[in-house]
Swiss-Prot record:
SUPFAM superfamilies given in the database record: DNA-glycosylase
EC number: 3.2.2.-, 4.2.99.18
The protein, known as: Endonuclease III-like protein 1
Record field: compositional bias (Basic and acidic residues): 22-37
Function summary: Bifunctional DNA N-glycosylase with associated apurinic/apyrimidinic (AP) lyase function that catalyzes the first step in base excision repair (BER), the primary repair pathway for the repair of oxidative DNA damage. The DNA N-glycosylase activity releases the damaged DNA base from DNA by cleaving the N-glycosidic bond, leaving an AP site. The AP lyase activity cleaves the phosphodiester bond 3' to the AP site by a beta-elimination. Primarily recognizes and repairs oxidative base damage of pyrimidines.
UniProt xrefs under InterPro entries: DNA_glycosylase, Endonuclease-III-like_CS2, Endonuclease3_FeS-loop_motif, HhH-GPD_domain, HhH_base_excis_C, HhH_motif, NTH1
Compositional bias segments (type: Basic residues): 38-51
All residue ranges annotated as the HhH domain in the record: 187-211
Subunit structure, interactors included: Interacts with YBX1. Interacts with ERCC5/XPG; the interaction stimulates NTHL1 activity and NTHL1 binding to its DNA substrate.
Length: 300
């Protein structure tokens, strides 16, 4: 009787242990439940299986056990490093208008940081479709009257127009300057926004101005500032996958491949190059070190 109880108890214990450990291909030989007797069940040997490794492309952002990340080659233009090195040589004197009259040279260095940032933004708003010399002249006249948020809001439109004339589209810029300045006073306590998204939301402020404002006013490189010079030269050198129609399209193309460490340099470098050698009309190809490397040289 006692032997029967032991057999039932051990049998239940074995079943419980199997259930708790999960399904297995086979169990090790066990002692029989009866005292001193070996189990008469035949011992099963494990089947030898060979692993099959299947390579597949992971879907929906999931990676398989044997899947490796797919490497997508990054497009980059031919000879761009040599072209850039040549432009650096041609710009080594830093004697282009942008080098003396750019946005980083138009503010009052003795003013408070908030006022300096405001003056940087205004100089960028004035610079659109305007030569650097004309922008610098307008900024000098504005600064002579005390260029602050408060002074601009107190200046009537006619007077402001006379001060900034002859910058391009000066009538529209009078309106944009007044509207933007009012927004800065109401929403930003007289300072300028510290993000590209907020800057481009201001009247008269485009992507190029916003990225330059972030760099000059805030010391942050948020993107490549592309104006007409950078847009023109990037297309002539084939620094874009295809010919682009707008500066903003050019910016997106450049940022896809140009190393970020060069983003802050490329604007001033190409703007000055475009002012002195790679001119919009009748470029000075004979004086350009990239004459043999420029795809557009033979067409200009």
């Amino acid at each position: 009787m006692n032997s029967g109880v032991r057999m039932v108890t051990r049998s239940r214990s074995r079943a419980t242990r199997i259930a708790s450990e999960g399904c297995r291909e086979e169990l090790a030989p066990r002692e029989a439940a009866a005292e001193g007797r070996k189990s008469h069940r035949p011992v099963r040997h494990p089947r030898r299986t060979q692993k099959t490794h299947v390579a597949y492309e992971a879907a929906n952002g999931e990676e398989g056990e044997d899947a490796e990340p797919l490497k997508v080659p990054v497009w980059e233009p031919q000879n761009w490093q040599q072209q850039l090195a040549n432009i650096r040589i041609m710009r080594s004197k830093k004697d282009a208008p942008v080098d003396q009259l750019g946005a980083e040279h138009c503010y009052d260095a003795s003013a408070s940081p908030k006022v300096r940032r405001y003056q940087v933004l205004l100089s960028l708003m004035l610079s659109s479709q305007t030569k650097d010399q004309v922008t610098a002249g307008a900024m000098q006249r504005l600064r002579a009257r005390g260029l602050t948020v408060e002074s601009i809001l107190q200046t009537d439109d006619d007077t402001l127009g006379r001060l900034i004339y002859p910058v391009g589209f000066w009538r529209n810029k009078v309106k944009y300057i007044k509207q933007t300045t009012a927004i800065l006073q109401q929403r930003y306590e007289g300072d300028i926004p510290a993000s590209v998204a907020e800057l481009v939301a201001l009247p008269g402020v485009g992507p190029k101005m916003a990225h330059l404002a972030m760099a000059v006013a805030w010391g942050t490189i948020s993107g490549i500032a592309v104006d007409t010079h950078v847009h023109r030269i990037a297309n002539r050198l084939r620094w874009t996958k295809k010919m682009t129609k707008t500066p903003e399209e050019t910016r997106k193309n450049l940022e896809e491949w140009l190393p970020r460490v060069l983003w802050s340099e490329v604007n001033g470098l190409l703007v000055g190059f475009g002012q002195q050698i790679c001119l919009p009309v009748h470029p000075r190809c004979q004086a350009c070190l990239n004459k043999a490397l420029c795809p557009a040289a033979q067409d200009l």
